[in-house]
Amino acid sequence: MKVDVLLGLQWGDEGKGKVVDVLTPKYDVVARFQGGPNAGHTLEFEGQKYVLRSIPSGIFQGDKVNIIGNGVVLDPALFKAEAEALEASGHNLKERLHISKKAHLILPTHRILDAAYEAAKGDAKVGTTGKGIGPTYTDKVSRNGVRVGDILHNFEQKYAAAKARHEQILKGLNYEYDLTELEKAWFEGIEYLKQFQLVDSEHEINGLLDNGKSILCEGAQGTMLDIDFGSYPFVTSSNTVCAGACTGLGVAPNKIGDVYGIFKAYCTRVGSGPFPTELFDKTGDQICTLGHEFGSVTGRKRRCGWVDLVALKYSIMVNGVTKLIMMKSDVLDTFETIKACVAYKMNGEEIDYFPYDITDEVEPIYVELPGWQTDMTKMQSEDEFPEEFNAYLSFLEEQLGVQIKIVSVGPDREQTIIRYTEE
């Protein structure tokens, strides 16, 4: 057996949570492989809206095993709040959610450090979510981190050492803070965490594969936020690309099967950094309003723009995407024309690739297509798609070289249309 991977191809917020929930019935296991509570996966069904930050999106399927892998960073306080909210709505987590002992813990001082570093950067700030993600991964790489497995023995000593080291750094930054409430909630989260199955996830996952179980690996954020391949330094602190599933779960490269790449019919970005197709006019505001484009974790208004095919082709390349999934098609239902960026103009030269030194000065070169101006939210099969929408899909597939297997026409799990069903 091989694992399949589901990941975002843009700057995050593509709708991965909903798609995982839609795909989950065909899998036995859903495993999260990177990131932390800085990204929220939003799911809507049966009139309820859920935002998952650390827990895999397969948790809503009652018979599925869900695994938080070693590549994830976990805040015990936020995890406790998220898990208790799910349990209160009738979902049994403790039997079905397994957590890697090798996952690193976000400490209260990591969150303080995150805020202090951003404050020190002034106008050059990256625009982090303030959840302590960067400082936690920094400690991991510098071999100073505290892991989930550490809570089982000699924990107080390791925590005290990490806290003292962080306080020395904060002293140098001259940043005022109060840990009292953060620490109280954090240690309550630690006790709650002990109630779950803490596992050697790499052994568990490979054992499940050997026993013929099907596994879906769930990524967070998006390819353009990858620490190596994103628009550095305006990126996250982990590998959001397909290779991150190997290092974040302990899966060998030859065990990767299908790679599902998710993108919106337009583009959004939260925080600072280059965004070639960003719109600063009423069209951008209209997309934001119709798409409800506000961060599920921070509540920040997302920057909006037309779909960027240059960036998408780059993401498809570095991930080895085999199947595409287009989200939020319905947001563009009322537009008379739709634009798609097919190249950039940079330093007076036209280029069709995503460059190392991309800046805000990059000018998008667009192709304009007719809009479909049809309400697609109640459509149940591709046979109902308007001619203009089919033309848009064909144009995208020709440009990107990969079939668009799934189209989302609304936020609910039922508003999902599978294409190429003859396969």
UniProtKB/Swiss-Prot annotation:
The active site is at residues 13, 41. GO terms for cellular component: cytoplasm. IMP binds at residues 13-16, 38-41, 129, 143, 221, 236, 300. Gene3D superfamilies: Adenylosuccinate Synthetase, subunit A, domain 1, Adenylosuccinate Synthetase, subunit A, domain 2, Adenylosuccinate Synthetase, subunit A, domain 3. PROSITE patterns: ADENYLOSUCCIN_SYN_1, ADENYLOSUCCIN_SYN_2. GO terms for biological process: 'de novo' AMP biosynthetic process; IMP metabolic process. Pfam families: Adenylsucc_synt. InterPro entries: Adenylosuccin_syn_GTP-bd (IPR018220), Adenylosuccin_syn_Lys_AS (IPR033128), Adenylosuccinate_synth_dom1 (IPR042109), Adenylosuccinate_synth_dom2 (IPR042110), Adenylosuccinate_synth_dom3 (IPR042111), Adenylosuccinate_synthetase (IPR001114), P-loop_NTPase (IPR027417). GO terms for molecular function: adenylosuccinate synthase activity; GTP binding; magnesium ion binding. Mg(2+) binds at residues 13, 40. Keywords: Cytoplasm, GTP-binding, Ligase, Magnesium, Metal-binding, Nucleotide-binding, Purine biosynthesis. Homodimer. Belongs to the adenylosuccinate synthetase family. This is Adenylosuccinate synthetase. The lineage of its organism: Bacteria, Pseudomonadati, Bacteroidota, Bacteroidia, Bacteroidales.
